[in-house]
Amino acid sequence: MTDLWPRLEPLLAAAERPARYLNHEFGCVYKPEADFRFCMVYPDTYELGQANQALRILVNVVNAVDGMAAERAFLPAPAMCDTLRAEGIPLFSIESCAPLAEFDAVGITLPHELAATNVLETLDLAGIPLHADERVESDPLVVGGGPCAYNPEPYAPFFDAFSIGEGEEALPRGLAVVRRLRAEGAARADILRALADEPGWYVPSLYRWRAEDEAQEAGSWIEPLEEGLPLRIEKSLFEGFAESPGWEPCIVPFTEVVHDRLNVEILRGCARGCRFCQAGMMYRPVRERSADNVVESVVQGLAETGYDEVSLTSLSSTDHSQIASILTRINRACDGKGVRISVPSQRLDSFGVDMAELVAGQKKGGLTFAPEAGTQRLRDVINKNVTEDDLFGALDAAFKAGWRRCKLYFMIGLPTETDDDIKGIASLAQRAYDRMKAATPPEQRGSLRMSVSCALFVPKAQTPFQLSLIHISEPTRPLYIS
């Protein structure tokens, strides 16, 4: 494979944050002897992509296969994209600084809708034809995955295949098919046909998209163009999640990234059923890692990475049946080491005095709660089964235990929303701040901090609200932003 480093290195002195483009980070795996090379791409800058837990997991599982190498690539900052084009340098991988177009397969994660144009920029910068039907035998297979792959049709013209669902088992299995057939000299079309037979894999070129009326009558939005293809694509599920280690050797970046800490996934799935939440629908059923697994992963991960903060990640971490035991044991193991424990997804109705003390650990950071809506009526509509009393009780417990910073997350534009619901956000936030203040000793109130975030509701595929579209041409009421 072509090594672009001699051409890239002279450009780094003028680049913003040049460490974004350096290889050989601590924990980086490079397998030059592999006979099949796969590049995992996050369509945004290194700081965002390297913090992505899915990318870390999938690079590890592919690299664990003998003869397969997984490398990483990220979309450079806009100024660097311009520089690469001016110098005629295509997008490259981090590990070997090789052009993406020279890999056997390129996987692009689809984290959110606003990354769609970044996907096209990634392909263009890599010199890979944008449209799947324009690619030839020498081009890599371009596969998509991630949250937006659950609604693949908007992206279908640009991808050869999609991995729908969790990728720990599906991705290596699909790549093994590609590897075997490429070694046999199979044509691109034959490889895609074989991939379509694998559970959880969708090949758009082998299906026809049905119009709405036709789809309702047939019971499916897609029609196979060949016999033997599944009418519905079922998501892949990693059934071995509970037994798998919560931490595996990971890359410690040279430069600061978002969520720059040790991340240990303790729980996958959510049983709460909020009607707007795609992740809660996608990652069912709920699966837990044991307390022993989690604690061992935290202790080992902190020792091997040097981080002083650990995040126990999931969609709803305080719903773990052993969360109290986990936090108690981690606090004991990290006593005196200055380690901060972060539990980013905290349910208001399961956060009390005991939980506040356990989460505090050696350092007290910030707490994040998500009432989502400003009134109880709207919370009931979206099936967010928490009350104002739950919020106030959680704040009382946390701030009496010594916390001084809090974030509240809301959404605007939800179905059935009225102006009263919008005003309710401001009212609830003010009353929440008053409770924080009342629970804090007067001499410490100057350090109180509350931030309120309001995200715009976006209908997500595979959720009860997926068809709750906003018709811009027919506004029902004004949206005031100040």
Feature names for model-found ranges:
Residues 46-49, 78-81, 114-116, 149-152, ...:
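Flexible loop/turn segments at secondary-structure boundaries
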Residues 55, 87, 123, 157-162, ...:
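Short secondary-structure boundary/capping segments
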Residues 41, 299-455:
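Conserved SAM/AdoMet-binding glycine-rich loop
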Residues 1-30, 35-36, 42-46, 56-60, ...:
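Acidic, low-complexity intrinsically disordered segments
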Residues 146, 269, 448-458:
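Core structural elements
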Residues 48, 109, 161-164, 230-234, ...:
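Hydrophobic alpha-helical scaffolding
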